[in-house]
A protein has these predicted regions:
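N-terminal loops that bind phosphate or other acidic moieties
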Residues: 1-133, 137-377
Length: 377
C-alpha cells in the first residue's frame, strides 16, 4: 500500500514537512507496513521556499539584500536538491513586513533587492528559477529589480531614474544591453494567482496600492507612472504589457518579469505540483492525504488541498484533507476533489493551545482516519 502525504503548512504552527511527519506518524500506528511518500507542499506564497527545499533535500542560503527603502536586510535563496533550481520569495527582499507602517510609501519603495536575490541565484549556477511575488511593499513595476540586474532606466538627459514608484515619472528610455547575460539561459517561473492588468481601475496601483500606503492622490500618480513605464517597454522591445493578465501583480512586477525577462506567470500551486512531480507519485498511490491550517470556502481558490486533490483525481485516487479547523461553508470542497475532511482540534481550547498542540492533535486525528480507512478494505 502506498500513501502520498502532501500537505501545506499550518501557519504560525507547523511547517509543511512537520505536518507531513505528524500525518505519517498517526497513520503508522494503524498501517505500519505501508509505503509513505511525503511531499511538503505550498501554494506559491509564504513557506514555498521551505517546502520545496525540504521536499528536494536542498538548503536555504542567506543573502544580504537591499530592503524596499534602501537599508540592508538578510534575505535568502532556496537551492533545491538538484543544484540546478532555486526558489526565492520577493517578500524576503521587498516585502511589506520590512517597512514600518508609518513609512510605507510606494512612491519611494523599490524592488531592487529582489533583483539582488536573482543575481545571488545566478551566482549559484542555477538554470531554473521559481519566484513567489506575494507580500510586496512596492509599486515600481519591477523597475528596481531590472536596475539591480544591470538594466538601465534613463531620464531624457541620459541619467538614471531614482528608485521607487515616483522615479518612473521621468523615465524616457530603457536600455537592457547591460542585463546580466546569464539571464538569457535562465528559465523563470513566477507564482502568480492574480489576473490584474498593469494599469487602470483593476491595475496594480488602484487595487493593491492602498494596502502599501498609497493615498488616493498617490494611486493616480502611480498609475500614470506605470502607464509611462509600459509605453517605454513597448518602445524598447515592441512588447505590450499593460493588459497582460497578472502584469499588475506585486506592484507591476508581473509586467517586468514577462515583458523584460521573458518569465512565465503560473498559479503557485501548479508550479509546486510540477516542481515536486506530484503526479508521478500519486499515479500509483492507494491514498492521497493533504491539508492546511484552515479549510473553508476559499480553499477552492488556488489553495494547496484543492490543487493536490485535482491532481489526484486525474488518476481516480481517494483524497483526504486534514485541517486545523473546518468552517461551516467548507462543504464546497467536496465538489473539487476532497472526498473527506477532518479537523484536528478535538475539544475547546485557546488559539495558542491549538497552535502549540497541533502535531499531537494531527496524530490523534489521523490515527482514527487510518483506522476508518483500514475498515473499508
Amino acid at each position: 500500500m502506498k500513501i502520498v502525504i502532501a500537505p501545506d503548512s499550518f501557519k504560525e504552527s507547523l511547517s509543511a514537512m512537520a505536518v507531513a511527519d505528524a500525518i505519517e506518524a498517526g497513520f503508522k500506528q494503524v498501517l505500519p507496513n505501508a509505503t509513505y511518500v511525503k511531499l511538503p507542499m505550498a501554494d506559491g506564497g509564504e513557506g514555498t521556499v521551505q517546502s520545496l527545499v525540504d521536499a528536494t533535500g536542498g538548503r536555504i542560503l542567506p543573502v544580504e539584500v537591499t530592503a524596499p527603502l534602501g537599508n540592508k536586510v538578510q534575505g535568502f535563496v532556496g537551492l533545491l536538491g538538484d543544484g540546478e533550481r532555486a526558489v526565492i520569495e520577493m517578500a524576503a527582499a521587498s516585502g511589506i513586513h520590512l517597512v514600518a507602517p508609518e513609512q510605507r510609501n510606494p512612491l519611494l519603495t523599490s524592488s531592487f533587492g529582489t533583483g539582488e536575490l536573482i543575481l545571488a541565484a545566478l551566482e549559484m549556477g542555477v538554470k531554473h528559477l521559481i519566484l513567489g511575488i506575494g507580500g510586496s511593499a512596492t509599486n515600481d513595476g519591477g523597475a528596481g529589480m531590472i536596475q539591480a540586474l544591470g538594466g538601465k532606466l534613463l531620464k531624457a538627459d541620459g541619467s538614471a531614474i531614482e528608485l521607487g514608484g515616483a522615479g518612473l515619472a521621468e523615465l524616457a528610455t530603457i536600455d537592457l544591453s547591460g542585463l546580466d547575460p546569464r539571464l538569457g539561459e535562465l528559465v523563470i517561473e513566477v507564482a502568480c494567482d492574480v489576473n490584474n492588468p498593469l494599469c487602470g481601475p483593476k491595475g496594480a496601483s488602484a487595487v493593491f496600492g492602498p494596502q502599501k500606503g498609497a493615498t488616493p492622490e498617490m494611486v493616480v500618480e502611480l498609475d500614470a507612472n506605470l502607464s509611462r513605464y509600459a509605453d517605454c517597454i513597448e518602445q524598447a522591445l515592441g512588447k505590450q504589457v499593460k493588459d497582460i493578465p497578472g502584469a499588475g501583480a506585486a506592484g507591476g512586477m508581473g509586467a517586468a518579469l514577462v515583458g523584460l525577462l521573458g518569465a512565465e506567470l503560473k498559479p503557485g500551486i501548479q508550479i509546486v505540483i510540477e516542481a515536486l512531480k506530484l503526479a508521478e507519485e500519486v499515479a500509483d498511490a492507494d491514498l492521497v492525504i493533504t491539508g492546511e491550517g484552515r479549510i473553508d470556502s476559499q480553499t477552492i481558490h488556488g489553495k494547496t488541498p484543492i490543487g493536490v486533490a485535482r491532481c489526484a483525481k486525474q488518476f481516480g485516487k481517494p483524497v483526504i484533507g486534514i485541517s486545523g479547523c473546518l468552517t461551516d461553508d467548507c462543504g464546497v470542497v467536496h465538489d473539487h476533489g476532497l472526498d473527506a475532511v477532518f479537523a484536528v482540534v478535538n475539544r475547546a481550547m485557546s488559539l495558542p493551545e491549538a497552535l502549540e498542540s497541533a502535531s499531537t492533535n494531527i496524530q490523534l486525528t489521523v490515527r482514527n482516519v487510518a483506522a476508518l480507512y483500514q475498515l473499508k478494505g
